[in-house]
């Protein structure tokens, strides 16, 4: 199967219905990631088919479980999960935050080439980031442990908002280290097409 066919099969397995233009944008995103990765080392994954599973489908597996209009992707890196979210949900407002200049250079170019008018890229350390408005959902995929994630981002969470962290195996120890005023709302096991590994979405909120 080519990349487009693999994507279609993966979306069907996830039960996600995207338009043909959205599917093309996701394929183009993988191609951009592959091209820039050769110079900027954005991901250890080197093959486009694996990038599709490890990065795009892994991000999209969490998409139906995220509820909010203003989303912050912390430590966005190569744009996961923020860019797949932005392509799939054009009515959402996405902010991709990373302190690494090379990564945000890629992100800015990807946003331009993909025509993502709902997406802003910010190069700044998360603890120094002071946006005009706070966020409904703060997400991360490979940023830090849960306690550190919450500590560094709590000033960015809107009232009633939630954290949504993509993790591998069930993070028992990380959950045990959370501060007392943070509750676990839900931990959902994710099944990612083409990925034979444990994946979980951890949703947290303030008590």
From Swiss-Prot:
The UniProt annotation places S-adenosyl-L-methionine binding at 75, 80, 126-127, 141
Q: Which GO terms describe its cellular component?
A: cytosol
- Kindly list the places in or outside the cell where this protein is found, as annotated in its UniProt entry: Cytoplasm
Reactions mediated catalytically: guanosine(527) in 16S rRNA + S-adenosyl-L-methionine = N(7)-methylguanosine(527) in 16S rRNA + S-adenosyl-L-homocysteine
Q: What is its EC number?
A: 2.1.1.170
Provide the alphabetized UniProt keywords.
Answer: Cytoplasm, Methyltransferase, rRNA processing, S-adenosyl-L-methionine, Transferase
A Pfam family found in this protein is GidB
Give yes or no: UniProt keyword Transferase: yes
GO MF term list: rRNA (guanine-N7-)-methyltransferase activity
Q: Which domain of life is it from?
A: Bacteria
Regarding protein family, the annotation reads: Belongs to the methyltransferase superfamily. RNA methyltransferase RsmG family.
PANTHER family in UniProt: S-ADENOSYL-L-METHIONINE-DEPENDENT METHYLTRANSFERASES SUPERFAMILY PROTEIN (PTHR31760:SF0)
Task performed by this protein = Specifically methylates the N7 position of guanine in position 527 of 16S rRNA.
What is the name attached to this protein's record?
A: Ribosomal RNA small subunit methyltransferase G
Species name: Laribacter hongkongensis (strain HLHK9)
Q: What is the lineage of its organism?
A: Bacteria, Pseudomonadati, Pseudomonadota, Betaproteobacteria, Neisseriales
Gene name of the record: rsmG
């Amino acid at each position: 199967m080519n990349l487009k066919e693999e994507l279609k099969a993966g979306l069907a397995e996830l039960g996600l219905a995207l338009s043909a233009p959205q599917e093309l944008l996701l394929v183009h995103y993988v191609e951009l990631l592959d091209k820039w990765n050769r110079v900027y080392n954005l991901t250890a994954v080197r093959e486009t088919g694996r990038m599709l599973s490890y990065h795009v489908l892994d991000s999209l597996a969490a998409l139906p479980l995220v509820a909010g209009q203003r989303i912050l992707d912390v430590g966005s890196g190569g744009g996961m999960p923020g860019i797949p979210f932005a392509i799939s949900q054009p009515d959402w407002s996405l902010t991709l935050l990373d302190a690494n200049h090379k990564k945000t250079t890629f992100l800015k170019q990807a946003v331009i080439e993909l025509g993502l008018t709902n997406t802003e890229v910010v190069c700044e350390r998360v603890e120094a980031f002071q946006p005009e408005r706070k966020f409904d959902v703060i997400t991360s995929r490979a940023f830090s442990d849960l306690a550190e994630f919450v500590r560094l981002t709590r000033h960015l969470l809107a009232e009633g908002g939630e954290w949504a962290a993509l993790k591998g195996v069930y993070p028992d120890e990380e959950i045990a280290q959370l501060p007392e005023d943070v509750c676990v709302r839900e931990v959902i096991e994710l099944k990612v097409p083409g990925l034979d590994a444990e994946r979980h979405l951890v949703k947290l909120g303030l008590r």
